[in-house]
Design a protein with these regions (language model features):
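Extracellular jelly-roll beta-sandwich "head" domains, especially the C-terminal globular C1q domain
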Residues: 1-139
Length: 139
C-alpha cells in the first residue's frame, strides 16, 4: 500500500495537534498518500494495518511536559500513543509510535498528528519518522 517518511525537522507548536509532514514517499502501490496534505485516502473498505512513529523534540524537553502522536480519521482522533514525559536531558529523543489494525471505509482520510505540551520540533530524517498503511483483510 504505502510508506512515507519525514526528511527534516519541523516546528511543533505548543499544545496543538499538528499533522506530521511525512514528505518523502518510499512506495505507494495504491496511490493513496497525498504529499501535499500528508493524508492517506483509503481506496477500498477493509481492515488496514497502520504503523506510525515520529521523532519529537530534537534536543529533548523538560520533565513537566508530555508528548505523543495520534491517528486521526476524517478529522477526529481515534487512537493515541503512550504519552511520555520529558527528562530534562537534551540527549533524550522521544519517538512515540502506534501500530494498530483499523476497520476503514473507502474514502476515509487518515493522518498522523504530533503533540507536545511544550513548543518543540518533530520529524527528523527517515530513521526517526515513518507512516505506513496496508490492507490486511476485506470485510
Amino acid at each position: 500500500m504505502f510508506s512515507a517518511t519525514s526528511s527534516k525537522w519541523e516546528v511543533l507548536p505548543q499544545n496543538q495537534h499538528t499533522i506530521v509532514k511525512y514528505d518523502s514517499v518510499v512506495y505507494d502501490t495504491a496511490k493513496m498518500y497525498d504529499t501535499k496534505t500528508f493524508t492517506a485516502k483509503v481506496p477500498k473498505d477493509g481492515v488496514y494495518h497502520i504503523d506510525a512513529r515520529t521523532g519529537i523534540a530534537q534536543t529533548g524537553f523538560f520533565s513537566g511536559y508530555t508528548e505523543y502522536i495520534s491517528i486521526f480519521k476524517n478529522g477526529t482522533m481515534i487512537k493515541e500513543s503512550n504519552r511520555s514525559r520529558g527528562t530534562d536531558n537534551d540527549r533524550h529523543l522521544p519517538r512515540p509510535s502506534l501500530s494498530v489494525d483499523l476497520l476503514l471505509k473507502k474514502n476515509d482520510e487518515i493522518n498522523i498528528r504530533a503533540f507536545c505540551s511544550d513548543q518543540r520540533n518533530y520529524g527528523g530524517e527517515s530513521t526517526l519518522s515513518e507512516f505506513s498503511m496496508r490492507l490486511v483483510g476485506i470485510i
